[in-house]
From Swiss-Prot:
Keyword annotations: Glycoprotein, Signal
Entry's family note: Belongs to the asfivirus MGF 110 family.
Organismal lineage: Viruses, Varidnaviria, Bamfordvirae, Nucleocytoviricota, Pokkesviricetes
Keyword Signal: yes
Origin superkingdom: Viruses
Function: Plays a role in virus cell tropism, and may be required for efficient virus replication in macrophages.
Signal peptide positions on this chain: 1-20
Organism: African swine fever virus (isolate Tick/South Africa/Pretoriuskop Pr4/1996) (ASFV)
Name listed for the protein in its UniProt record: Protein MGF 110-7L
Keyword flag Glycoprotein: yes
Glycosylation sites: N69, N70, N105
Length: 137
């Protein structure tokens, strides 16, 4: 009988540990950071996609870190912003480089993208050619 009770207590304790470690990964507190955990990028980049941590940029062309090659590449310009993110309980907050703050309820998130007008999709050969000056002919 004692073995059964100890077994049940052990199962309850282990399920509680799994549940608390899961909530730590996707919930709980996240101090202000320019580099959110890799497993949370999909969340943070879905609601404010212009954050620099959402993009891998090289030679002026950026590819999504979340959706990778399955997404459209973009031209690195004013659309890509330095952002810091933080989470305190159920409040998720973005601090964008111009001291613009966007807060939302983490469990009821809303997309926010005031920089959408600056987004330029990269098209092969369209942005690779430098404009030549007269003396470079």
């Amino acid at each position: 009988m004692l073995v059964i009770i100890l077994g049940i207590i052990g199962l309850l304790a282990s399920s509680n540990l799994v549940s608390s470690s899961t909530s730590t990964r996707v919930g709980g507190h996240l101090p202000l950071t320019f580099d959110p955990p890799e497993n949370e990028l999909g969340y943070w980049c879905t609601y404010v996609e212009s954050c620099r941590f959402c993009w891998d940029c090289e030679d002026g062309i950026c590819t999504s870190r979340v959706w990778g090659n399955n997404s459209t590449s973009i031209v690195e310009n004013d659309y890509v912003k330095y952002c810091e993110v933080s989470r305190w309980g159920n409040l998720c907050r973005y601090d964008v480089e111009e001291h613009i703050y966007y807060s939302m309820n983490c469990s009821d998130p809303k997309p926010w993208n005031p920089y959408k007008i600056a987004r330029k999709e990269w098209k092969k050969n369209e942005y690779l050619r430098k404009d030549l000056k007269k003396d470079e002919f």
